């Protein structure tokens, strides 16, 4: 039998209907729902007199629009209406909901894994582009639009053209202070925001195998910023250990049977990809974005580039515009860029390991004068654990604001807006113009780099800093 990639195995396992020249109809194992992209979908069902086909394969939470302070008092009318609509829709259609009073509430791509809803071999969709996060478990996870949300609610299926396969193999060992966030920023920085266009990426190699599940989630989360339809990692013992005992994961003998099935999903030896990229881990350093898309980045040792450094006129024009928006001069060392805001959070970097890494930098120090720093845990469970471990107190003692869970300052859709013209060191995934608020200037970094920027008031090389034990 011809060796297959995990991508081919999961895809073929889920094809319900196929016709030459048309997209495949895929069965969907898990549909995650939030308050922003679902109201019109539910309204569509209502108007057509349809039910949700599989409420038991659907799970909802509220994350994008929720305040992270006084969360039950929602002043914005649009946000208030969206949250009320989700509560009403979940009641009417019998969908499980982790609402603002629930201990299970959080960012949808944080709670799916921590509750054990996310499992190897599943097809997973959500009306959010960073659904690719769940691919870290060896799942095929896509972001979908509102009309597709309605289609999945009604039929538990999705029409999809089968993408090509791209292997990104990261060999060797990462240097001290280099994180999963730096790896994915380096990939996008070197190969561009369209390297994955038309592909599903499988991340392989020694570096990926040595990563925790939370680090793999960071990598897969930003597959979308590389242009891919999805990104994933073949499941292994690290995956199974993470899932064991989680609320919605199989239990006892059923779990052992599931592990047998999950093991068989891994890409076969000799399987062929449409394209392969190899990266030497030792060439990756802590990264900082300087521009207005995630490929506009350099290492902490670098400088803001000159437009003339780029070969094409189109690139030069884009760089000029980005530098103007960001208020940066070519040739400026990255370490001399001042920051006025720091945001540690988002579906990319708001898990317990992210907060531990940031706390190691922060412990015993103070936030620099003129810097406002937020730490927003990705879920209420992460918040509780961080408080129990003493991490929250480390941040509070240093002058950080410690918040409830939500998407927060990742996107300018809730009260946590970055003011116009001010620079934010952010652990999120997008640095587009206006992403964190009108005129906000976003620099994407790892949690450790963001924490260091908060303490020093500008970017610093975390490899040169003393880290304190935190637990």
Swiss-Prot record:
Q: Does the keyword Metal-binding apply?
A: yes
The first-level EC class reads lyase
As cofactor, the record names: [4Fe-4S] cluster
- What's its catalytic activity? (2R,3S)-3-isopropylmalate = (2S)-2-isopropylmalate
Sorted alphabetically, which InterPro entries does this protein's record hold? Answer: 3-IsopropMal_deHydase_lsu, Acnase/IPM_dHydase_lsu_aba_1/3, Acoase/IPM_deHydtase_lsu_aba, Aconitase_4Fe-4S_BS, Aconitase_4Fe-4S_dom, IPM_dehydratase_rel_enz, IPMI_cat
Q: Which GO terms describe its biological process?
A: L-leucine biosynthetic process
Per the entry, the cofactor note is: Binds 1 [4Fe-4S] cluster per subunit.
**SUPFAM superfamilies the UniProt entry points to:** Aconitase iron-sulfur domain (SSF53732)
Q: Which pathway is it part of? A: Amino-acid biosynthesis; L-leucine biosynthesis; L-leucine from 3-methyl-2-oxobutanoate: step 2/4
List the Gene3D superfamilies hit by this protein, alphabetically. Answer: Aconitase, domain 3
Keywords of this protein's UniProt record, alphabetized?
Answer: 4Fe-4S, Amino-acid biosynthesis, Branched-chain amino acid biosynthesis, Iron, Iron-sulfur, Leucine biosynthesis, Lyase, Metal-binding
Binding positions for [4Fe-4S] cluster?
347, 407, 410
User: Disulfide connectivity?
Assistant: none
GO molecular function terms listed in the Swiss-Prot or TrEMBL record: 3-isopropylmalate dehydratase activity; 4 iron, 4 sulfur cluster binding; metal ion binding
The text of the family note is: Belongs to the aconitase/IPM isomerase family. LeuC type 1 subfamily.
Q: What does this protein do?
A: Catalyzes the isomerization between 2-isopropylmalate and 3-isopropylmalate, via the formation of 2-isopropylmaleate.
- Oligomer and partners: Heterodimer of LeuC and LeuD.
- Please name the HAMAP family in this protein's record: LeuC_type1
NCBIfam families on file = leuC, PRK05478.1, PRK12466.1
- The protein, known as: 3-isopropylmalate dehydratase large subunit
Gene encoding it? leuC
């Amino acid at each position: 039998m011809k060796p297959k990639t995990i991508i081919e195995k999961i895809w073929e396992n889920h094809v319900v209907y196929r016709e030459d020249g048309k997209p495949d109809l895929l069965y969907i194992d898990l549909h995650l729902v939030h308050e922003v992209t679902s109201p019109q979908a539910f309204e569509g069902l209502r108007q057509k007199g349809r039910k949700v086909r599989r409420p038991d394969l659907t799970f909802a939470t509220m994350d994008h629009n929720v305040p992270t302070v006084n969360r039950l008092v929602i002043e914005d009318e649009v946000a208030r209406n969206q949250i009320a609509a989700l509560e009403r829709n979940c009641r009417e259609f019998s969908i499980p909901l982790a609402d603002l009073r629930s201990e299970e509430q959080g960012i949808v791509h944080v709670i799916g894994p921590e509750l054990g809803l996310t499992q190897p071999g599943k097809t997973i969709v959500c009306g959010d582009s960073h659904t690719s996060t769940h691919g870290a478990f060896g799942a095929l996870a896509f972001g979908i639009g509102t009309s597709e949300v309605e289609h999945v609610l009604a039929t538990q299926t999705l029409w999809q053209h089968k993408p090509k396969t791209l292997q990104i193999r990261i060999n060797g060992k990462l240097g001290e202070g280099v994180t999963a966030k730096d790896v994915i920023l380096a990939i996008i920085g070197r190969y561009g925001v369209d390297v994955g266009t038309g592909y599903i990426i499988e991340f392989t190699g020694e570096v990926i195998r040595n990563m925790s599940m939370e680090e793999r989630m960071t990598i897969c989360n930003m597959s979308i910023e590389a242009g891919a339809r999805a990104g994933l990692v073949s499941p292994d013992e690290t995956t199974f250990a993470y899932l064991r005992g989680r609320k919605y994961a199989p239990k006892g003998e059923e779990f052992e049977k599931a592990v047998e099935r999950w093991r068989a999903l891994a890409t076969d030896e000799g399987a062929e990809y449409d394209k392969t990229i190899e990266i030497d881990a030792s060439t990756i350093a802590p990264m900082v974005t300087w521009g207005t898309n995630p490929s506009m980045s350099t290492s902490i040792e670098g400088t803001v580039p000159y437009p003339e450094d780029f070969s094409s006129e189109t690139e030069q024009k884009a760089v000029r515009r980005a530098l103007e928006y960001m208020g940066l001069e070519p040739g400026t060392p990255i370490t001399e860029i001042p920051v006025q805001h720091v945001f540690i959070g988002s579906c990319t970097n708001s898990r317990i390991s992210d907060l531990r890494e940031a706390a190691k930098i922060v412990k015993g120090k103070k936030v620099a004068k003129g810097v406002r720093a937020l730490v927003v845990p990705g879920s209420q469970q992460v918040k509780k654990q961080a408080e129990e471990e003493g991490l929250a107190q480390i941040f509070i003692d240093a002058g950080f604001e410690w918040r409830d869970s939500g998407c927060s300052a990742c996107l300018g859709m809730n009260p946590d807006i970055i003011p116009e013209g001010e620079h934010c060191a952010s652990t999120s995934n997008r640095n587009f113009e206006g992403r964190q608020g009108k005129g906000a200037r976003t620099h994407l970094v790892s949690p450790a780099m963001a924490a260091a920027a908060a303490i020093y008031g500008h970017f610093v090389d975390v490899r040169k800093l003393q880290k304190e034990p935190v637990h």
